[in-house]
From Swiss-Prot:
Keyword Calcium: yes
UniProt family annotation: Belongs to the GHMP kinase family. GalK subfamily.
EC supergroup of this enzyme: transferase
Tissue: Expressed in roots, stems, leaves, flowers and young siliques. Higher expression in the elongating middle stem region than in the lower or upper stem region.
UniProt-recorded name of the protein: Galactokinase
Protein source organism: Arabidopsis thaliana (Mouse-ear cress)
Free-text cofactor note: Magnesium. Can also use other divalent cations like manganese or calcium.
Signal peptide: none
pH curve summary: Optimum pH is 7-8.
Active site (catalytic residues): 210
Length: 496
């Protein structure tokens, strides 16, 4: 039997296999009907097919996927649906949205076009998918013929800037729609890698978790996502618990603030890993050429710890990376090389170096190694012989530890998230933490199932009420920003 990551994206002729029954199916049916009608209105023809990909909430394992470590997310029911058709007679990509906030974007049907990153447009995410798919097809020897036009209509209900991977849901559904309309269907693990590469076209050094869970998710299961190679292991969460997702209402624009936030941490981790390599015996030139992530030097760190009767890589961090921030000059002295050269003059990394005044290497490495351990602690707890009650308590503790590390060591929180996490904990959550890139977006709270009906009104009262009064959010939109979620299904293609 094929492994889950080795099967291709399922193709359905009805909505039930993905959206189930009852109110969720009703809502989905209405969305698809409206999407089809709008497509006809905008483009004067019917779509050939639809593709969908969900957002996700990361339960634990923040900012470690790009360091080569496993993460533990689940898909949520909110998704992006794309209707698409090929237009042989025109050489344009016309990308429209059901939401009037996003005006139609038009691009040439040219897979080699450059994306104008200085002029940030929502349609750029589709072009990431378009370029990435063509590059991948070419590398596989797939002949797509000369470029043709595409008409595209997007309906996304994953809140943007929320830490729930609206961008990955868009890029994944776009890639799958393009793939399907050209008559292909790759394995899920190939798509996970391909879509991760796609998002790098927009200047985000994505680690791959968001794309992997969006494509590989299964109803009823969280997934332990491993990398190199990408694979997913089902994780059945204990009975009696529910995850509540709450938006801080501070939007995180990952692609816009990347040089000072997200990509900055990627570079700091790279520098920390190279210095650890050198301190643990590698020649500077060898470390610079071979070491890319903290997982690359974990073996050396564990050997160092082993000589001291431990297996914890944090011992090496404490010994060899000072807690005070490093200057560029200090790092260059240790590594005997200029920083731009160390990062291979990569434009994304150079933008980070230009914006940075210092580098907190000790704190970033300490977060990554401790968070990687918490992910496996989470999975081991789920699979243990503890009672469901004891499991839930332990999972909550791990989530609380994770948030502290994200906030204090990785500094990817913000005042709104700190307040929201505190409100969750004070009103019955077993554990709560920021989820996603941070610097805004959402928190996820683990709550006993029978407490959810009291928990949600309490959080509304303590966190959202004053924001409704100030006009930050409308009362009728609250269900978009605060909701309980069970693990939902992954990517799909529909011929309806």
């Amino acid at each position: 039997m094929a492994k889950p990551e080795e099967v291709s994206v399922p193709i359905f002729t009805s909505l039930e296999p993905v959206y189930g029954e009852g109110s969720l199916l009703q809502e989905a049916t209405q969305r698809f009907d409206v999407l089809k009608a709008n497509f006809n209105d905008v483009f004067g023809a019917s779509p050939q097919l639809f593709a969908r990909s969900p957002g996700r909430v990361n339960l634990i394992g923040e900012h470690i996927d790009y360091e080569g470590y496993s993460v533990l997310p689940m898909a949520i029911r909110q998704d992006t649906i794309i209707a698409i058709r090929k237009c042989e007679d025109q050489k344009q990509l016309r990308i429209a949205n059901v939401n009037d906030k996003y005006t139609m974007c038009t691009y040439p049907a040219d897979p080699d076009q450059e994306i104008d990153l200085k002029n940030h447009k929502w349609g750029h995410y589709f072009i990431c998918a378009y370029k990435g798919f063509h590059e991948y097809a070419k590398s596989k020897g797939v002949n797509l013929g000369s470029p043709v036009g595409l008409d595209v209509l997007v309906d996304g209900i994953v809140p943007t800037g929320s830490g729930l991977s609206s961008s990955a849901a868009f890029v994944c559904s776009a890639t799958i729609a393009i793939m399907a309309v050209f008559g292909h269907n790759f394995e899920k693990k190939e798509l996970a890698q391909l879509t991760c590469e796609c998002e790098r076209h927009i200047g985000t050094q994505s680690g791959g978790m968001d794309q992997a869970i969006s494509i590989m998710a299964k109803t009823g299961f969280a997934e332990l996502i491993d990398f190199n190679p990408v694979r997913a292991t089902d994780v059945k969460l204990p009975d009696g618990g529910s995850f509540v997702i709450a938006h801080s209402l501070a939007e995180s624009q990952k692609a816009v603030t990347a040089a000072k936030n997200y990509n900055n941490r990627v570079v700091e981790c790279r520098l920390a890993s190279i210095i650890l390599g050198v301190k643990l015996g590698m020649e500077p030139k060898e470390a610079i050429s071979k070491v890319k992530t903290l997982s690359d030097v974990e073996g050396l760190c564990v050997s160092f710890a082993g000589d001291r009767g431990s297996s914890d890589p944090l011992l090496a961090v404490k010994e060899y990376l000072k807690e005070e921030p490093y200057t560029a000059e200090e790092i260059e002295k240790i590594l005997e090389e200029k920083l731009p050269s160390i990062v291979n003059n990569d434009p994304t990394s150079l933008a980070v170096l230009n914006a940075a005044t210092h580098f907190k290497l000790h704190q970033r490495a300490a977060h990554v190694y401790s968070e990687a351990r918490r992910v496996h602690g989470f999975k081991d707890t789920v699979n243990s012989n503890l009672s469901d009650e004891e499991k839930l308590k332990k999972l909550g503790d791990l989530m609380n530890e994770s948030h502290y590390s994200c906030s204090v060591l990785y500094e990817c929180s913000c005042p709104e998230l700190e307040e929201l996490v505190q409100v969750c904990k004070e009103n019955g959550a077993l554990g709560a933490r920021l989820t996603g890139a941070g610097w805004g977006g959402c928190a996820v709270a683990l709550v006993k199932e029978f407490d959810v009906t009291q928990f949600i009104p309490a959080v509304k009262e303590k966190y959202y009420k004053k924001r409704v009064e100030k006009g930050v959010v409308k009362k009728e939109d609250m269900e978009l920003y605060l909701f309980a979620s069970k693990p939902s299904s992954g990517a799909a293609i529909f011929n309806l």
